[in-house]
UniProtKB/Swiss-Prot annotation:
<comment type="similarity">
    <text>Belongs to the UPF0178 family.</text>
</comment>
<dbReference type="InterPro" id="IPR003791">
    <property type="entry name" value="UPF0178"/>
</dbReference>
<protein>
    <recommendedName>
        <fullName>UPF0178 protein SPO3827</fullName>
    </recommendedName>
</protein>
<dbReference type="Pfam" id="PF02639">
    <property type="entry name" value="DUF188"/>
</dbReference>
C-alpha cells in the first residue's frame, strides 16, 4: 500500500498533502523532531523523532520504498529514497528522479563549497513560496501518487 511520507521541517504544503492523501485514502506519515500540532485525521500519523542531525531523514529513508511518495527539500534524503524506489517531490512540485538526483547532489555540494569559501557573503535565502508553486505541487503530487500506486501493484 502506498504511503505518503512528509519531511515536515519547514514544509509549507503539509495541509495540501493531507488533503490529497485523504482523497486517495493513503496513509500519511508526517515526520519531525517536534513542534507540530498532530492531525485529527486517522490516516495521518505524526511521528516525532529524537532531536539530532538527520534523525527525521533517517526515519523516512529506512521506511520509504517502491510504491511510496516522499515530500522533502533535503537532497541527500531524496537520493536515498529515489535509490530505494520511492517517488520524491520538493514542496514546489519538482520531482527528484534517478535521472536528475546525481546532478542535484553535485549542485548541492558545489553550493555548500561556495558558501564555505565566502563566509561573509550575503545569504539571501530562497524565493517566497507562491500560489503557482502550490498549484504546481498539487498537480505533481496527484501525478506521483497515481504512479506510485501503479508501482506498488507491480
Amino acid at each position: 500500500m502506498t504511503t505518503l511520507y512528509v519531511d515536515a521541517d519547514a514544509c509549507p504544503v503539509r495541509a495540501e498533502a493531507e488533503r490529497v492523501a485523504t482523497r486517495h485514502r493513503l496513509r500519511m506519515a508526517v515526520v519531525s523532531n517536534g513542534g507540530l500540532r498532530p492531525s485529527q485525521n486517522p490516516l495521518v500519523e505524526t511521528v516525532i523523532v529524537p532531536d539530532g542531525p538527520d534523525v527525521a531523514d533517517q526515519w523516512i529513508a529506512e521506511r520509504a520504498g517502491r510504491g511510496d511518495v516522499v515530500i522533502t527539500a533535503d537532497i541527500p534524503l531524496a537520493a536515498k529514497c529515489v535509490e530505494a524506489g520511492a517517488r520524491v517531490l520538493r514542496h514546489n512540485g519538482e520531482a527528484f528522479t534517478p535521472a536528475n538526483i546525481g546532478q542535484q547532489l553535485a549542485m548541492r555540494d558545489l553550493m555548500a563549497d561556495l558558501r564555505a569559501a565566502n563566509p561573509l557573503g550575503a545569504g539571501g535565502g530562497g524565493k517566497p513560496f507562491s500560489k503557482a508553486d502550490r498549484a504546481r505541487f498539487l498537480d505533481a503530487l496527484e501525478r506521483e501518487i497515481r504512479a506510485a500506486q501503479r508501482d506498488a501493484q507491480g
